[in-house]
């Protein structure tokens, strides 16, 4: 049986659709980085899977052949519609026209070839039992399928370049207008240009926001979110800082304040473009060192690999890796804000880890020369000991950083220093300004260092990026508050200078609030709370439009409708428990299938809470938004399962693919229902959505169970093969 195709870019860097004897693989250079492209390909991949996953030289009933022909024709028709859209895009983008047209021609030819190869009108080999024996050119179908997927992917990626071009063009317009704003000398001219700037920023915010939501890479999404947050907050700062400069053109601190805002916005704009184009200017590389928790995680994986392979790596590499991790501990031990008790405990655990690594290396050397049971047990004990020490070290570091952050946030909750700076400003008290500016600088250094420590123990790359963003924000905003306060102190009666200081102080307070949220998220990750059930919730912000505000009011169905929703929700809640039980069976909790399954269960649980009037989902619009994300996560799960199926034998693979092909249509149906407008029938829409979700969760439970069994079977077969191979090797030596 040919390897089944899976969506490009799923579970790997390249867009590889399969391998094996069929050679059903796509150009590995076609890397897919966005969810929209991936999801556009999924229905096509599913149909092609149906076409090529059949045995060669088998008897097929007339009904089966007609079904195959219908799929072939459907693929061809879908490709035809797709090509028309591609050609329209080409006509609007002359710089990409030739490339898109070539890919469209290839796609059209491949679609026609598949339709021709699955056409049964010319088959007349009817057997006596009413069955038709077909000798379809399966190699031809696979070649055409490979060409089709490759060309369709090329068109989608070229169309994606159009989106990137739009974002770059929008950024360039914003930059050009910013340059005009920097040079403006009159209020009237400033107001006109800023109005244009505001419109351009709104356009850029929409384009970059859509791109952020479309990115597959969570690290890039977090970086994009950080850059967009800077732009959003700096837009108001730019307005007040520029007005202050125009009001007080000879004030040095006002100019310094304004320049700081412009510089930060330019850096953020460049960061967005860097992310969407996936390239750094002038060949720059990411110089930020990995966090302590990430280093410990990688180190533990290396020592645990010794259970399987004693020659996997060198002793020197392990020693160097541990020393690098312990060297980074200096961020904690050298910090003036780390308590004496925490410092002593960190140093003690670091010394213990060094000693246990030396013991492990000693046993490891013995294990390489002596293959005895006692040595193997001693090696296992050494691995467990150092793993335990590292876990204790992680706990101590986490306790140190989070306790410091919590104390700091509590201490600065009333913003005494900011209030004092505002007061000294309107009083024109330069002496008091110097005193409170010094206090704010101290507070800033504390917060910056705390963010640095939190990054080490954050636990995930997106949270690491959020910590870096918080650190940079405190660093920059602290200086800007001082320059804004200095301007007000020099011009105490200036309303615009006071307004400007207020804006920067609000930005500081907002970042303090964000840091509280960040601390909660870091604790949730560390403790593995069920609080992660809300991890994928991303609610839209209410608009000022009355219609939108109306739709965001909590929906109140009648008692009968509430009872029906509650009943559906109860079944959904039970299914999330079943899914969680299946997930707990897996030894490898980092497995992609497990991660997507856990995410779906998490979101389904928040839907269940919604049916009880609890949890974070407050309105039907919140619910619909969450369901859209749930459907997308389901499609990602099917992609990972398809990738796993390629490792299985034909019968097991077919059994798994049948389950996948049940889930994919449900995901698409749920996406369709969420987009369908049902005026004054909100309950009907919610009812349909929860019913679809329940069906998907039931399939998820089956899929998780089946994948777990097939994985265990695969591991046993592989272990058996290794044992036989080793025995044959020993026999040959004898």
From Swiss-Prot:
Organ and tissue specificity: Widely expressed. Expressed at lower level in neural tissues and at the highest level in the adrenal gland.
InterPro entries, per database record: Alpha-catenin/vinculin-like_sf (IPR036723), Alpha_catenin (IPR001033), CTNNAL1 (IPR030045), Vinculin/catenin (IPR006077)
Key word Membrane present: yes
CC per GO annotation: cytoskeleton; cytosol; plasma membrane
GO molecular function annotations of the record: actin filament binding; cadherin binding
Protein name listed in UniProt: Alpha-catulin
Originating species: Homo sapiens (Human)
Similarity field: Belongs to the vinculin/alpha-catenin family.
Membrane topology field: Peripheral membrane protein
